Amino acid sequence: MAAQQDIRIKLKSYDHTLIDKSAEKIIRTVKSTGAVVSGPVPLPTEKKIYTVLRGPHVDKKSREQFERRHHKRLIDILSSSSDTVDSLMQLELPSGVDVEIKV
């Protein structure tokens, strides 16, 4: 019998709906193997604002702002088994979600 291990999964994405759907998919998969799940915990959103001039010549007062939001979620899996790890490896997530797994 394999030792039980704790797994921490960090999800990052620019789209909050995509990251929430991915988190629900992971939780459904893990709960089907019988492991205990804590989360998803929403972590602070990183917001980066870029300010650029609208025109190439004059009108310094005319500017435009763009922002990039980086959403993050944290999922802890407690008392996992080898079946849990296998099911997580088989899971397919959308390409817009970055997954970081720590055992």
UniProtKB/Swiss-Prot annotation:
Ribosomal protein keyword on record: yes
GO biological process, one term: translation
Keyword terms of this UniProt record: Ribonucleoprotein, Ribosomal protein
GO molecular function: structural constituent of ribosome; tRNA binding
Source organism, top-level taxon: Bacteria
GO cellular component: ribonucleoprotein complex; ribosome
Protein purpose: Involved in the binding of tRNA to the ribosomes.
Family statement: Belongs to the universal ribosomal protein uS10 family.
Assembly with partners or alone: Part of the 30S ribosomal subunit.
Protein name, per record: Small ribosomal subunit protein uS10
Organism: Salinibacter ruber (strain DSM 13855 / M31)
Recorded name of the encoding gene: rpsJ
